[in-house]
């Protein structure tokens, strides 16, 4: 079952808030809900009914594979297009895929933090 835009965003928000030591807010613009771990961004949810996307960090080789596999996964909006991908509603974009993308992004960011700043194990 494909995740519609609002469900995609709600799923991403729920997945992010279930992770340890996550904060979120609107530091850039009122339309971008930004999720961070230890002050580092791992998820951006676009609050725009005409462009219901999420943007997550991704290993470059995995990002390329995802972009080839799904038409609604594109290089990351707003950020380094090599290390970030944006997911929009479309065929194959399931709640499980969204949750996995958010969790993978969190893990990528958390593992690069100095040991003292890393969240407790999840």
Residue ranges and their predicted role:
Residues 1-122:
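Charge-dense, helix-prone N-terminal extensions
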